Design a protein with these regions (language model features):
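Acidic/polar active-site rim loop that often engages polyanionic ligands
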Residues: 77
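Core segments of cupin and vicinal oxygen chelate
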Residues: 7-60
Length: 139
């Protein structure tokens, strides 16, 4: 069994996936647009350039995503994508990149269980936890 995360965006899925590809080292393997739907499938007017389905390989996992109408889109509130990083420096670098123009929930700092731990919502509405675990606590 595999468990993948499917992220919804309020019209900026392509921008989010391109950002994650560039900044996190992912690889977009598919982007299908609403404009590519067969003519027999009902379409949302004006959504030809919006993402119907996207797929990105990121480390050992896969992120999936799509655009949804902005009147139903809400930023993530009850779940976080969690990055477990190898060094404090890598954690600090990615925290700075992801938090730019986003919202910080918990500043990046040392805790009793991690050399670095922080929580944020990025500019695209995706919530993240970044952790550089302490070796004696991680397992």
């Amino acid at each position: 069994m595999k468990l993948y995360t499917y992220l919804n965006y309020g019209g900026n899925c392509r921008q989010a996936f391109e950002f994650y590809e560039q900044r996190l080292g992912g690889k977009i393997t598919m982007i299908q647009l609403h404009g590519e739907l067969p003519a027999s499938v009902p379409r949302i007017p004006g959504w030809e350039d919006k993402v119907l389905h996207a797929r990105m390989e990121l480390g050992d996992t896969v992120l999936l995503g799509a655009d949804i109408p902005t009147d139903v889109f809400q930023p993530m509130r009850s779940a976080y994508l969690t990055l477990i990083l190898e060094t404090p420096e890598e954690t600090e670098q990615l925290y700075a990149l992801l938090s730019e123009n986003g919202e910080i929930f918990m500043k990046l700092e040392e805790t009793f269980f991690a050399k670095r731990f922080g929580m944020l919502r990025d500019r695209f509405g995706t919530s993240w936890m970044l952790i550089n675990e302490k070796p004696d606590v991680a397992r």
